Each structure stands twice: as C-alpha cells, then as structure tokens.
C-alpha cells in the first residue's frame, strides 16, 4: 500500500503518489479506463489535471461520477494569466469535470517574470482564483512551475500570497546542479515552516529527447523505462519525507511507478544514484 501524508495544511491525507492525469490527455477511452483501474487498485486518492491537458478533464468526468467525487482530492490548473480569462477557464474546467468544485486550483507553470507580474497583479489570474475560492468553486490555491527558476520563483510567490501548495521538478539529475539544489532546499524549508504542500514532477526523467521527439511520445522528455531504474528514481524522491510525487504523463509507465511506490524501501544512496546516472547516460532536463 502506498503510504499517505498530510497534504500541507489542507487537512487532507494524500497518497504520496499523486495521479498525474496528463497521462489521459491523448488516451483513448479504453486506455483511460485501464489507467483509472490502476488508480483504483492502488487506492490513489489525489488526482491532478489541468485545463491544458487535452481531454484529461473530460476523461475524468464519468469516472468521478461513477466512483464518488468526494472520495478524491481533485486538482486542476489554469494557465491563463489575466483575471477574465482565468475566471472563464476555471468555470470551464468545472463543467468539463462535471463537478461543482475542485479541491485545488493551481496557477500553471508560473515562472516567467513578466507573466508572474500579470497573474499576481490586480487584474490577474490570482484574483480569479481567490474569487473562485470565496464562491466555493475551489477550496485551496497552489502554484506550479517548470525549469531551473521554478524553486526560486515559488519562493517569490509565497512571499506575495499564502499559496497552499507548490509543484516543481525534483529528481537526482536536476538536484546535482548546486544552484538548483540550493533553491530547492530553501523552498522546501519555507514550505515546511508554513505548512505548504510540496508536489514534485519529472521523477523518472532520463533526459531530453536526442534529436526530434518521437511522434508517439507521451512525455516531452525521455523517461526511464526499466522497472529497476524506476524503482530507484521513485524511492529517491519519496525518500525525502513529506513530499509528493506526481506520476508521469506516459500512461504505459503508470503501473511501474505505482509498483515502485507500493513496494517502497529505503532511499538509494548517492553512489547508487550516480551509478544509475552513469549507466543510463542520464542528463538534466533543464539547464
């Protein structure tokens, strides 16, 4: 059984593996059903989607209706930066999901400095999120980010507004960058101090695609594929107490990530992770 932990100060106990519903963005109905059966079997109770994830919200809607909406901590995201566009997208997401509220609404990939100023300004997306919370359409508000600046930008966001959660890349290869590691550690310390939930992504990254990305690729990076490699990568992330791991967008690798988290084990040593890096030729996704 995948263990649970408090999701920050929200009062919800979430499985430490969160279903990244980006995996449903291009999935057929049959593939989506198989993925959601795995979610059910492993008793995942936290689902993370986004308005920009293709058909993901639509794929979740009938499954939520059939399995009991209130059994799940449901999160979505808006990538809009202005008030009106974000407010419209929030309501559209609720309609697509077939629900009257979500538990967590996140400002999606808010790392660009100019976009940050718009979103956090008086006529920005944050205002729409707060109004949605006040109206009972969302319960909590978070912020997500990709790239090397995400941890530092999240610290800046937390100084401006008491976000309930953050999400950023966290894996062995990325954390070998001293500047990124220092920013991540500072963010983690701030989140622990303030009761902010920490979600992590890109746990099973092998590196950027070499050459042109395959047309059928489910992830925009090349993932690890062997179960033993995924075991090490997942155990390393979950070896950091209190943080959560959002599963990758490759639906074919979902079972391996779930199996790794369910079996658990001690956190791999630095030597073990360096050996994995060297044997597989792992490289940072963000530089």
Residue ranges, per PLM feature:
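Short, acidic/polar
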Residues: 26-39, 83-98, 148-158, 228-233
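A short, structured active-site edge motif that brings together acidic residues
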Residues: 70-82, 104-108, 168-170
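Active-site mouth loops of central-metabolism enzymes
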Residues: 17-30, 75-85, 114-118, 145-149, ...
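Beta/alpha (TIM)-barrel catalytic core signal, keyed to glycine-rich beta->alpha loops juxtaposed to Asp/Glu
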Residues: 55, 110-287
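Active-site groove signature of glycoside hydrolases
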Residues: 94-117
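Conserved, mostly hydrophobic/aromatic
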Residues: 7, 19, 39, 47, ...
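N-terminal binding-site loop/beta-alpha segment at the start of enzyme catalytic domains
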Residues: 1-72, 128
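Acidic (Asp/Glu)-rich catalytic clusters
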Residues: 8-11, 40-41, 61-71, 91-100, ...
């Amino acid at each position: 059984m995948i263990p649970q932990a408090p999701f920050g100060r929200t009062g919800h106990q979430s499985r430490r593996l969160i279903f990244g519903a980006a995996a449903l963005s291009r999935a057929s109905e049959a593939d989506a059903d198989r993925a959601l059966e795995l979610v059910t079997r492993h008793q995942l109770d936290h689902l993370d989607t986004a308005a920009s994830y293709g058909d993901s919200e639509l794929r979740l809607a009938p499954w939520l209706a059939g399995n009991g909406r209130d059994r799940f901590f449901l999160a979505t995201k808006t990538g809009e930066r202005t008030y009106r566009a974000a407010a419209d997208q929030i309501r559209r997401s609720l309609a697509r999901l077939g629900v009257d509220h979500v538990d967590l609404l996140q400002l999606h990939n808010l790392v660009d400095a100019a976009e940050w100023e718009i979103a956090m300004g008086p006529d920005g997306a944050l205002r729409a999120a707060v109004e949605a919370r006040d109206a009972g359409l969302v319960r909590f508000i978070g912020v997500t980010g990709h790239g090397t600046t995400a941890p530092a930008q999240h610290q800046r966001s937390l100084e401006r507004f008491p976000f309930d959660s953050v999400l950023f890349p966290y894996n062995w290869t990325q954390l070998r960058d001293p500047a990124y590691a220092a920013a991540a550690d500072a963010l983690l310390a701030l989140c622990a101090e303030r009761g902010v939930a920490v979600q992590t992504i890109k746990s099973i990254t092998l590196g950027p695609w070499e050459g042109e990305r395959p047309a059928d690729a489910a992830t925009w990076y090349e993932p690890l594929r062997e179960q033993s490699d995924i075991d090490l990568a997942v155990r390393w992330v979950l070896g950091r107490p209190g943080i959560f791991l959002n599963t990758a967008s490759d639906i074919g690798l979902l079972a391996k990530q779930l199996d790794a988290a369910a079996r658990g084990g001690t956190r791999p040593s630095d030597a073990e992770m360096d050996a994995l890096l060297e044997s597989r030729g792992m490289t940072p996704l963000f530089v």
